[in-house]
From Swiss-Prot:
Gene3D superfamilies: 1.10.520.10, Peroxidase, domain 2. Its EC number is 1.11.1.14. The gene is GLG4. This is Ligninase H2. GO terms for molecular function: diarylpropane peroxidase activity; heme binding; metal ion binding. Residues 1-21 form the signal peptide. Keywords: Calcium, Cleavage on pair of basic residues, Disulfide bond, Glycoprotein, Heme, Hydrogen peroxide, Iron, Lignin degradation, Metal-binding, Oxidoreductase, Peroxidase, Signal, Zymogen.
Length: 372
């Protein structure tokens, strides 16, 4: 599995960092800006990119719609790779190669990429200004965006994605109306990800919202704390659904437990499938596990299609994540353990407190402004 290969590569890299720690400190290079130093001169170019996007893309380092969409871009660009197609003599996509921007006139017309044309338009000027590759920028912006969310792990960034040469084929990005079997088959083909690692990837929905799933309403979060990288998503997806936040009958959605909150059909199914339910539940009130697993799987995702041994580790450019500023997981006001649809057969659902007060609607997240 690609997952196992990455683990081995990271283990070797960590060993080398430990054994060579003192020499590396002496070999740091001074960056041209006169402010920063780096372990590799190639990383210096990314400090100005960081300053620029933190101020002008993420509005001073906020965990808002732009951060959510930057993370979405990483998934939709990276997962578009198929060794299965390659084995049939067809082009299977380049993975994390920036093709969703390079060939945006093609790939943003694919159904699962609806709405990403606006994100592409927002990100393109930054790429042109700094002269970096599209694939590297997507991965970098995604890592920085996540780091702006309290509770996020220390994100990693590896440099060295060449420009895409072809548009990725259609049909490689999972959709919310797909079955569990369809999603798992796609994830296994793309990166050797199994059902457990797929759950790790879905942790991204802790800081996500839907802008285009329901065309009648945008900015619908998938949990009640979209500005925090926490485990609340894994609590609320196990609550019994009671109503749709907007229009009923939207393909790929099911009833959610809270007003203003959207629940994707795939999230609902993963929380209840016997292959994934226990891993899903394991994140509840386990911030350390959430951070460690997402840090790892983001790196695996954002390097799909590339040899990590040929890439440069520039993780030092990614800022330290904002610290946890929230308490343990909880039941939203008006909800209790009785509202949980228990699916993990081997482990009881954790004991949680219920938030005080009357039940309230989850606030919408304003979408990113349209580019000029």
């Amino acid at each position: 599995m690609a997952f196992k290969q990455l683990l081995a590569a990271l283990s070797v890299a960590l060993t080398l960092q430990v054994t060579q720690a003192a020499p590396n400190l002496d070999k740091r290079v001074a960056c041209p800006d006169g402010v920063h130093t780096a372990s590799n001169a190639a990383c210096c170019a990314w400090f100005p990119v960081l300053d620029d996007i933190q101020q002008n893309l993420f509005h001073g380092g906020q965990c808002g719609a732009e951060a959510h969409e930057a993370l979405r871009m990483v998934f939709h660009d990276s997962i578009a790779i198929s060794p299965k197609l390659q084995s049939q003599g067809k082009f299977g996509g380049g993975g994390a190669d920036g093709s969703i921007i390079t060939f945006s006139s093609i790939e943003t017309t694919y159904h699962p990429n609806i709405g990403l044309d606006e994100v592409v338009a927002i990100q393109k000027p930054f790429i042109a200004k700094h002269g970096v590759t599209r694939g590297d920028f997507i991965a970098f912006a995604g890592a920085v965006g996540v780091s702006n969310c309290p509770g996020a792990p220390q994100m990693q960034f590896f440099l060295g994605r060449p420009e895409a040469t072809q548009a990725a084929p259609d049909g490689l990005v999972p959709e919310p109306f797909h079955t569990i079997d369809q999603v798992l088959a796609r994830m296994l083909d793309a990166g050797g990800f199994d059902e457990i690692e797929t759950v790790w990837l879905l942790s991204a929905h802790s800081i996500a919202a839907a802008n285009d799933v329901d065309p009648t309403i945008s900015g619908l979060p998938f949990d009640s704390t979209p500005g925090q990288f926490d485990s609340q998503f894994f609590v609320e997806t196990q609550l019994r659904g009671t109503a749709f936040p907007g229009k009923t009958g939207i393909q790929g959605t099911v009833m959610s437990p809270l007003k203003g909150e959207m629940r994707l059909q795939t999230d609902h199914l993963f929380a209840r499938d016997s292959r994934t339910a226990c891993e899903w539940q394991s994140f509840v009130n386990n911030q350390t596990k959430l951070q460690e697993d997402f840090q790892f799987i983001f790196t695996a995702l954002s390097t799909l299609g590339h040899d990590m041994n040929a890439m440069t580790d520039c993780s030092e450019v990614i800022p330290a994540p904002k610290p946890v500023n929230f308490g343990p997981s909880f039941f939203p006001a008006g909800k209790t353990h009785a509202d949980i649809e228990q699916a993990c057969a081997s482990t009881p659902f954790p004991t949680l407190i219920t938030a005080p007060g009357p039940s309230a609607s989850v606030a919408r997240i304003p979408p990113p402004p349209s580019p000029n």
